[in-house]
Amino acid sequence: MVALDCDAQRALELAEMLKGKATWVKVGMTLYYAHGPSIVHAMKERGFKVFLDLKFYDIPHQIEGASYSAASKGADMLTMHTSGGVEMMKAAQRGAVRAAEEFGYDVPATLGITVLTSMNDSTLAEIGVSRGMADQVKLLAELAQTAGISGVVASPQEASALRELLGPD
C-alpha cells in the first residue's frame, strides 16, 4: 500500500508510476479534504483499490451518512475511531453496506482506529482515560469486534495481544 500524503499533482504522478506495480493507495485527510471525491475517482480510474483514511468520529447518524458517501465514491476501505462506540461503528457499517448494494460495489472494509500512535499513557490521562495504552487498545478493539466491523488498526506492538484476545482475523 502506498500512502499518498502529498498534493494531488504528485499523487497523480505517483499513480501513473505505480500503475501495475501496486494495488492499494491510501488517501488521507489532507489530500481528500483538498480535492474531495475526485481524488478517489482518479485512483479508481487508474485501477487502484482505495484505502480512504478519514478516521470518522461523530454521532451515528452523521457517520452512517459519511460512510455511505465514501463507499458510494468507490472507497474500498474506510476508517473510524472506535472510541465513538459500538452504535457509531454499526452505523458506519450500515452506510457502507447500503452504498455498496445501491452502487454495485464490493462492501468496503471498515477498520477501527483504537488509539492514535501519537498517543501514550500521558496523553490518555490528559483526556481523562485512566487505563494504560495496552488496556485501552484492548477495550476499543473488543468494541470494534462487538460492532461487527472488519478489523482494527493498531501498532505492531499490540498485534499479538489483539490476536490472542480477538482471534487470528
Model-derived features with residue positions:
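N-terminal glycine-rich anion-binding loop in soluble enzyme alpha/beta folds
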Residues: 1-21, 97
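Catalytic domains of carbohydrate-active enzymes, especially glycoside hydrolases
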Residues: 17-26, 73
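Anion (oxyanion) recognition and catalysis
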Residues: 19, 44, 104
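Conserved beta-strand positions in the central sheet of alpha/beta enzyme cores
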Residues: 23-26, 51, 79, 153
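Active-site cofactor/substrate anionic-group-binding motifs, chiefly glycine-
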Residues: 26-29, 40-59
